[in-house]
Amino acid sequence: MTYVVNDECVKCKYTDCVDVCPVDCFYEGEFMLVINPDECIDCGVCVPDCPIDAIKPESPELIEWVERAKDFIENKGWKNITKKKPALPDADKFKDEKNKFNKYINNMN
């Protein structure tokens, strides 16, 4: 089992979660973070640190996010992030928007 970063992170990319992860399993793309499911130890320590509630435990309805994370890391070259950095400049503007992945990322692939 792993934790996943979902649609809420898109266009926000708050990185509070990165600082608390004991195994450095977060990876970043231009508009969001993902958790490497092969590195996550399922501790959940990152969950309360996400200010927009974008981190959830793996479940059948979130399996697509596990697959996306693997694809972004293995095929798109997303790099490991181990230190907190500022959120995206318009994060507050996008934090309440829904279905951001299909609108901003899926169309780029």
From Swiss-Prot:
What GO molecular function terms would the record report? Answer: 3 iron, 4 sulfur cluster binding; 4 iron, 4 sulfur cluster binding; electron transfer activity; metal ion binding
Record-annotated residues binding [4Fe-4S] cluster? C21, C40, C43, C46
| SUPFAM superfamilies listed in its UniProt record | 4Fe-4S ferredoxins
Per UniProt, the cofactor note for this protein states:
Binds 1 [4Fe-4S] cluster.
Could you say which cofactors this protein requires?
[4Fe-4S] cluster; [3Fe-4S] cluster
The protein's matches in NCBIfam families, at most eight in alphabetical order, are given as: FdxA_Protbact
The family database entries (InterPro entries) matched by this protein are listed as: 4Fe4S_Fe-S-bd (IPR017896), 4Fe4S_Fe_S_CS (IPR017900), 7Fe_ferredoxin (IPR000813), Fd_C (IPR022569), FdxA (IPR054829), RnfB_subfamily (IPR050294)
Q: Which key words are in the record? A: 3Fe-4S, 4Fe-4S, Electron transport, Iron, Iron-sulfur, Metal-binding, Repeat, Transport
Q: What does this protein do?
A: Ferredoxins are iron-sulfur proteins that transfer electrons in a wide variety of metabolic reactions.
Domain of life of the source:
Bacteria
Q: Which organism is it from?
A: Rickettsia felis (strain ATCC VR-1525 / URRWXCal2)
Q: Which Gene3D superfamilies match?
A: 3.30.70.20
Annotated [3Fe-4S] cluster binding lies at C9, C17, C50
Q: What is this protein called?
A: Ferredoxin
| Segments forming domain 4Fe-4S ferredoxin-type | 2-30, 31-60
Q: What PANTHER family does this protein's entry cite?
A: FERREDOXIN, OXIDOREDUCTASE
